[in-house]
Amino acid sequence: MLFPVSIKGVLLEAGRVVLLENEREEWELPGGRLETGEDPMACLVREFAEELGVSVIIKAILDCWLYEVLPARYVVIVTYGVERAGVEALRLSAEHRRLGTFALDELDGLPMPEGYRRSVRAWAAIAFTAKGSPARLPERGGASASRDF
């Protein structure tokens, strides 16, 4: 059985996570469908530009799981932790109903898949080390965005 793949990113702004409300009235992470032949990280950079008008640097892969979007309709979700690459203001595209930023303690009250909550908490734990700087992973090629993992 084949499933579509959706690449999502966790962006924390001043301790708050950026989320988008979809047509099912669920809050979700920015990102979208991986195109055939597309590098997953290039997909995420493209999706952040399309959905929020911002450029991002991909820092770490966080999680992967199978999500039942609708009854008997599944998608593989892959999440990454990201940081801003510029200072552009966040803007809402026509793909979503609303844009919101939420404190970590507000997540449990939101209609959203548990896997997204898990990814947000994982990135919050990784992103701020004792030194106050993001965790670093070794760089790998592929996406067109600058990455320093």
Regions found by a protein language model. Name each.
Residues 5, 66-89, 100, 127:
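Active-site-adjacent beta-strand/loop module that shapes the phosphate/pyrophosphate-binding cleft
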Residues 51, 55:
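Short alpha-helical functional segments enriched in proximate histidine and acidic residues
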Residues 81, 91-123:
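NUDIX/MutT-family hydrolases
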Residues 13-50:
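Conserved Nudix-box catalytic region and its N-terminal flanking loop in Nudix hydrolases
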Residues 1-27, 56, 60:
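N-terminal strand-loop-strand
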Residues 117-149:
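Charged phosphate-binding loop/patch that engages nucleotide di/tri-phosphates or the phosphate backbone
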Residues 14-16, 23, 83-88, 104-106:
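Short loop segments at secondary-structure junctions
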Residues 2-4, 12, 72-75, 94-96, ...:
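A generic fold-level signal
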